[in-house]
Amino acid sequence: MKKNFWFWGFTDSAETWNGRFAMIGFMAVIFIELVTGKGLLYLSGLMN
């Protein structure tokens, strides 16, 4: 079985992909906050 092959359900490869996407999303939020100087909740209109 390939490590990066996608299988449906709670498998090791699915959890690996989930972790990768979570890290990308987290870094995107940090980048947006650094560039704009405002938090994500403020930019989305939840903290107005």
UniProtKB/Swiss-Prot annotation:
Which GO molecular function annotations are given, in alphabetical order? Answer: chlorophyll binding
Q: What is its main location?
A: plastid
Q: Gene3D superfamilies this protein is in?
A: Chlorophyll a/b binding protein domain (1.10.3460.10)
Report the GO terms under cellular component. chloroplast
Q: Where found, per UniProt?
A: Plastid, Chloroplast
User: What are the UniProt keywords, alphabetically?
Assistant: Chlorophyll, Chloroplast, Chromophore, Plastid
Please indicate if the UniProt record lists Plastid as a keyword.
Answer: yes
UniProt keyword Transit peptide present: no
- Where are its TM segments located? none
**Family (UniProt):** Belongs to the ELIP/psbS family.
Q: What does this protein do?
A: Possible role in chlorophyll and/or carotenoid binding.
| Name of this protein | Uncharacterized protein Ycf17
According to its UniProt entry, this protein's organism is: Porphyra purpurea (Red seaweed)
